[in-house]
């Protein structure tokens, strides 16, 4: 096991002088983020954890740890938390495109070395703060989990991703061993979907897990009306990458056109637009596809659409799926990952197999030709979106952490 003997020796010397974590009015929770700025669902979820702790336990001293200063840290200050900037090295990394197999040969030794200062710094922080609990956000940052284990502090790990299947990460210690270590370093592993939970349990059936769905409270909309003769407009929001499914969406639009049905597609997100524009041109649907960069305000884009899309190959949860539903849009999604936990086929949207452009096109053409069906699914989508409210999330989190 990673540095096992060394950790046991340190543990015997540093276990807070055999004193328990602080109880009562001076209780402290340390929450660790893997990022410093907004730009993904993980940062939003981290902020929601901070808000939950402050809302439900105002007397709790909450310390938020970030790898560096950024707008996430600045935003969380308003909730009355302390900010700590600390070295939070990762044990999972994106594969090098030009040589994806080189990591095991060159990466293990230097990556292992950079973990040690992070663990040492975390131990010193916990010795000073004497926290009641520690929470790590996302599966990629182990330092504070290891430090909490060394010092006998209850640690909870929030796993919001599959890691390997969705982000194609390379894990320093291997994927299976990493998941098992997450289990051993945590009192409870908090997953953001049952799909993620099942993926973790498949690798370590002894892992103690629970599921808490994220908060989604974007503005509620009214299901948009589509006038006779008006083209169906669909929208996909997310970082431009193969795993997020923009290419699948464009291919489905081409399939629909070949079947004699023109459907307009809007893509919104960060990343390179050029490959998507070239694909649309090659498939003869450039006139139907519009591509936009990232924006903090999607209200206008939602309002202009009739149907939302979730085309990811393996989405852990899919915050934008719920955002589209809250805007009054039925969602056509892939039957993979956590998406089927949100989209119920024929109730609030339609499902097709991951990577199946023909299947997605068929679902879109069904909604294009059946406006009453689309409207009924839109109503179901709005109702479904009510499941992801803040009070539900906060109550579940506080109960799991034993802070009620």
List each model region and its residues.
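A conserved mid-protein helix/loop that constitutes part of the nucleotide-sugar donor-binding site
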Residues: 40-51, 232, 236-255, 322, ...
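Glycosyltransferase donor-sugar binding loop
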Residues: 64-71, 216, 237, 241, ...
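Short hydrophobic beta-strand element within catalytic cores of glycosyltransferases
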Residues: 330-333, 343
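A conserved nucleotide-sugar
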Residues: 57-61, 234, 246, 250-290, ...
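Nucleotide-sugar donor phosphate/pyrophosphate-binding loop at the beta->alpha transition
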Residues: 117-118, 143, 154, 163-185
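Aromatic "clamp/platform" in nucleotide-sugar-dependent glycosyltransferases that forms part
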Residues: 294, 313
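Carbohydrate-associated surface elements
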Residues: 195, 215
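Conserved acidic donor-binding segment of nucleotide-sugar-dependent glycosyltransferases
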Residues: 345-346, 350-357, 366-371, 386
